[in-house]
């Protein structure tokens, strides 16, 4: 899903039963805390956050100043491959928005 840092969904789809607008609305609070942690630890702004849940992963990646990418993965997904692709194509994705 692509969303604004304000939590408004720009484009996205999810598995049946998941509400993309609701998911997008939940991301800004997480990003705000991650940005705060980056400032407090002097590590800079957030590029990518990886959350491991019991039944999968949530990846939040900054695309541009005001846009984010949210990817939901099953536990069996190739996490390393996805992170590589996000880093590699981040600029390309951002240019499409």
Each model region followed by its residue ranges:
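Acidic, low-complexity cytosolic segments
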Residues: 6-97
């Amino acid at each position: 899903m692509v969303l604004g840092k304000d939590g408004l969904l720009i484009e996205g789809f999810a598995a049946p039963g998941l509400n993309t607008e609701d998911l997008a609305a939940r991301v800004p609070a997480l990003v705000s805390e991650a940005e705060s942690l980056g400032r407090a630890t002097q590590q800079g702004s957030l590029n990518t956050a990886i959350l491991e849940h019991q039944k999968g992963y949530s990846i939040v990646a900054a695309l541009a100043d005001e846009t984010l990418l949210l990817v939901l993965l099953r536990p069996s997904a190739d996490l390393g491959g996805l992170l590589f692709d996000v880093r590699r194509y981040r600029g390309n994705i951002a240019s499409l928005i």
